[in-house]
């Protein structure tokens, strides 16, 4: 009896052959490369040869798409037509959906179950032919019909119906456009102020300057900067809707640079409320709105750089007020306009620009104090005294401020103190006398000028100002006659 045979085992695979098999396996598992038909499509050629494709008809209602093999261009089925393995693919922008709204899967296609071509987009669109289409696919179909008739193609102008805005609460611009929300809220209460002056030997008036302000009472009280309205004879206010009114000056605080004017308006006006500037924090977003260069309702944004920039730091020796510093752009004409927080509350009055990115606003807490005191004065019937002005905006010059300006402007005068002229308002005594921007007033009537307050004090007392100003590296003698006006 023979012993049982051992089971047959194939000879061991040589190491070299095993290595070749391992290297070949991933290559065979890779998807078909470009030029190869989709491996899952039944009846597709091994390689796609576009030269062997039959040319599609000249006009395709559903547009031209690739066939199931991804090789040849064919006419896609239009919206609402049947689709599937037997019927062919859907047209451009359409998807094949079986009953109950389920997209046709590979399993459904293998079972040869038909579906319907449905547009992947279901929102209306407005076309360049001023027509509203139910969806993008219908617009594309209309565009193809136009091209067949040798007409211009129809393109998409906007989402949504023609003539209507697109409100998508889930869009990023709808969620995060908080600045626009603030502007929309405050703009109706911001006014444009224009200042007029009579020409000599003529009754004709001409506009000579402009500024901004904001309404604080429904009956027409408006807050602005004192320097905006105390230097001209007639003040005109223009509302956002274009209506214009003559304004009367009710009260002025020159030291704080705040003024209160009033217009007579029938009906109630929109107003802005004052916020608490004491609660303001560095880094908060702020919005400045006004009429720079007479461009009404111009909006700039920025952050609060500091909430307490002391007047003495700005060279205002006798100032007891802390200013709000912001990098929001404030230009000529923005003066008097509101600086608001994201709640739409006024936290300051735009008042001063030193240079790009460094601007200052009077805090709203100071405005509240002014309005309260003004109410008391008017309730007691105290008369407002006449005001003198020469028509300049100035700031006190300190050694640190002079160094900063010297670094920015090489031709800045070589001085360490005085009153630095930021702006000379047209058609004023200052302009008539020859003062210019960037001049530094160093003496008046033989008395040295150390700060802007020295100039203000002399203007109140003297009827003639014999000034010495430093312009570049020259000292120039200038005579200015202050003008007295009724507030």
Swiss-Prot record:
Residues 1-29 form the signal peptide. Residues 40-120 form the IGFBP N-terminal domain. GO terms for biological process: positive regulation of apoptotic process; programmed cell death; proteolysis. InterPro entries: Growth_fac_rcpt_cys_sf, IGFBP-like, Kazal_dom, Kazal_dom_sf, PDZ, PDZ_6, PDZ_sf, Peptidase_S1_PA. Transmembrane segments: none annotated. The keyword rRNA-binding does not apply. This is Serine protease HTRA1. It comes from Bos taurus.
């Amino acid at each position: 009896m023979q012993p049982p045979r051992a089971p047959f085992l194939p000879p061991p695979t040589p190491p070299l052959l095993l290595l070749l098999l391992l290297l070949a396996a991933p290559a065979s598992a890779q998807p078909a490369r470009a030029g190869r038909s989709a491996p899952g499509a039944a009846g597709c050629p091994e390689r796609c040869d576009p030269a062997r494709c039959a040319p599609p008809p000249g006009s395709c209602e559903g547009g031209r798409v690739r066939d199931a093999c991804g090789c040849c261009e064919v006419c896609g089925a239009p919206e609402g037509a049947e689709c599937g393995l037997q019927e062919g693919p859907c047209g451009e922008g359409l998807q094949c959906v079986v009953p109950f709204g389920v997209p046709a899967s590979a399993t459904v296609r293998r079972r040869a179950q038909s579906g319907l071509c449905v547009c992947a987009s279901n929102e209306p669109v407005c076309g360049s032919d001023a027509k509203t289409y139910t969806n993008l696919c219908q617009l594309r179909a209309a565009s193809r019909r136009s091209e067949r008739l040798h007409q211009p193609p129809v393109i998409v102008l906007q989402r949504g119906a023609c003539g209507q805005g697109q409100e998508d609460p889930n869009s990023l611009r709808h969620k995060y456009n908080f600045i626009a929300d603030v502007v929309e809220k405050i703009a109706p209460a911001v006014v444009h102020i224009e200042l007029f002056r009579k020409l000599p030997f003529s009754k004709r008036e001409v506009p000579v300057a402009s500024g901004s302000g904001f309404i604080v009472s429904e009956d027409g009280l408006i807050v602005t900067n004192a320097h905006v309205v105390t230097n001209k004879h007639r003040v005109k206010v223009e509302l956002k809707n274009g209506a214009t009114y003559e304004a009367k000056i009710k009260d002025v605080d020159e030291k704080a640079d705040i003024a209160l004017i009033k217009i007579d308006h029938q009906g109630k006006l929109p107003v802005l409320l004052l916020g608490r500037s004491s609660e303001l924090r560095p880094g908060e977003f702020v919005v400045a709105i006004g009429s720079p260069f007479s461009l009404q309702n111009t909006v700039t944004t920025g952050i609060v750089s500091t909430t307490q920039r002391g007047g003495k730091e700005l060279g205002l020796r006798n100032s007891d007020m802390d200013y709000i510093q912001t990098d929001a752009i404030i230009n000529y004409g923005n003066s008097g306009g509101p600086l608001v927080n994201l709640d739409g509350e006024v936290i300051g009055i735009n008042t001063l620009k030193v240079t790009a990115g460094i601007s200052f606003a009077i805090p709203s807490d100071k405005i509240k104090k002014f309005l309260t005191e003004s109410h008391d004065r008017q309730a007691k019937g105290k008369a407002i005294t006449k005001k003198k002005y020469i028509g300049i905006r100035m700031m006190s010059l300190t050694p640190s401020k002079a160094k900063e300006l010297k670094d920015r402007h090489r031709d800045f005068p070589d001085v360490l103190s005085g009153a630095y002229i930021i702006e000379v308002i047209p058609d004023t005594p200052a302009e008539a006398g020859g003062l210019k921007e960037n001049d530094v007033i160093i003496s008046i009537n033989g008395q040295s000028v150390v700060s802007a307050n020295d100039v203000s004090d002399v203007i109140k007392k003297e009827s003639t100002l014999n000034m010495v100003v430093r312009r570049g590296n020259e000292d120039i003698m200038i005579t200015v006659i202050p003008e007295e006006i009724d507030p």
